[in-house]
């Protein structure tokens, strides 16, 4: 489905929980085919690790572990999640962290999270629950609903870092 001139939604299950019904070899075939058609692929998987999310991560050039701030245990949860990827030779360059619903959403908060994590935090996103919910409920992109919002600025910042990584690589400032 074409969302706009630069964004296409290729496929998805009716609900995230149905991802376990997708055969791994079928997912890998779709990823391989998509790589030949598109410069960037975003594969959104449900929270937690399952064979499907692991296969997607293993085929990725970069894996973003995204956590929503919601009570204080997120740093420990992300640290534990990163342990799963520690066996990858290029883990430090290939696995990045992003925190959402960060208040205040600024570089100081990103630095504090980086310090708490013990590794770089690639980006922080503001708490934009209402606009994200409205966009999801209406099949729209949050960026289209509020293109000048702090959320849009944060997403555009991360997209810019993906497209044009800093000289030392993504995650370096």
Region annotations inferred by a language model:
Residues 1-36, 133-137, 141-144:
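P-loop/Walker-type NTP enzyme "switch/lid" segment
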Residues 137-173:
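NTP-binding/hydrolysis catalytic cores, primarily Walker-type P-loop NTPases
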Residues 21, 25-36, 40, 45-123:
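Conserved catalytic-core segment of NTP-binding enzymes
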Residues 11, 98, 126:
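Residues in well-ordered beta-strands of folded domains
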Residues 13-14, 47, 129:
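Short, well-ordered turn and helix-capping elements at secondary-structure junctions
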Residues 101, 114-142, 155:
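Beta-strand-loop-alpha "switch" segments that mediate conformational coupling across diverse proteins
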């Amino acid at each position: 489905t074409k969302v706009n001139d630069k964004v296409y939604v290729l496929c998805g299950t009716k609900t995230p929980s149905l991802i376990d019904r997708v055969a791994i070899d079928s997912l890998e075939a779709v990823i391989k085919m998509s790589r030949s058609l598109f410069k960037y692929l975003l594969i959104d998987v449900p929270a937690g690790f399952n064979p499907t999310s692991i296969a997607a991560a293993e085929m990725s050039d970069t894996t973003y572990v995204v956590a929503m701030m919601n009570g204080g245990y997120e740093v420990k949860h992300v640290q534990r999640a990163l342990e799963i990827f520690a066996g990858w030779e290029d883990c430090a360059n290939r696995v990045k962290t992003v925190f959402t619903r960060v208040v205040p959403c600024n570089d100081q908060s990103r630095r504090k999270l980086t310090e708490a994590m013990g590794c770089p935090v690639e980006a922080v996103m503001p708490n934009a629950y209402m606009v994200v919910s409205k966009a999801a409920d209406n099949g729209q992109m949050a960026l289209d609903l509020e293109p000048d919002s702090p959320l849009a600025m944060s997403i555009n910042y991360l997209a810019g870092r993906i497209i044009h990584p800093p000289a030392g690589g993504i995650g370096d400032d």
